[in-house]
């Protein structure tokens, strides 16, 4: 890559005609999934609504990491597919999907395969011709973290839903010819505002929130996965319909308080005024009591369907 005049910073260059493979990365993360009722009761901040998630066999190919079209199965049945019906239940149609957070490994095999997959999927779902679909190539920044890759993408996609801004692929010089011919795609080199505030007047005319985006992970082990994440406004609308505006207001107040507390704690940790990590103290298995072996309590709790957390703060089984 250096011999081609490409700087190290731009080695990962998804969809570019001079791409030459992924940049290795390491990392992981945690995504908290919750039922809507639990989120409302606990006042949990909602970053997005999981509209659809599924994994697929990706076919037998020439090598273990080679990608295929298996995730196209999400669109089996077209407008009557499980994906289309799941999104419709949240008020989302094919034309409302604004972007795809692509696996985009910057390899010769993956990038065109994935673009073809989403082009075919968009047509199967009934997306209108000319309705642009923004490609987000997050690995050009993070590298390829293998097991943590999709977690990174979930974080990035929810940030786009919150901000209305899609990141650009700064490493992209010229879109490879096989990809450039695919319909729908927009390949931004710089961040672009899809919704919300922007422009001289402070607002994109007629633009509402980014309603939904797709995320795909392809390849290794001949397995692929697809996730559809819908704007958190879908949760708010469902809560309003089920419990009224007062419930929405109560949830918002609690969620905003949690977000503020989290921000304060993170910033305090960054300047050394609070620990960023604290080990777990007490697993509620009776560690403090010499009469109970925590290891045995844990094993019994996992096997006993009647095990419950007692008023003393310790798990008890039917022993």
Label the predicted regions:
Residues 23-44, 144-169, 180-202, 224-233:
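Active-site-proximal alpha-helical scaffold in enzymes
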Residues 85, 303-319:
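Extended non-globular C-terminal regions
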Residues 41-47, 91-96, 126-133, 205-209:
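Short helix-terminating capping/connector loops at secondary-structure junctions
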Residues 20-23, 216-220:
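Short Gly/Pro-enriched turn/cap motifs at secondary-structure boundaries
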Residues 130-137, 193-212:
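Short, hydrophobic/aliphatic alpha-helical segments
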Residues 1-23, 53-74, 102-112, 129-186:
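Acyl-CoA/ACP chain-elongation machinery
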Residues 4-92, 98-99, 228-295:
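Condensing-enzyme catalytic core mediating Claisen C-C bond formation in acyl metabolism
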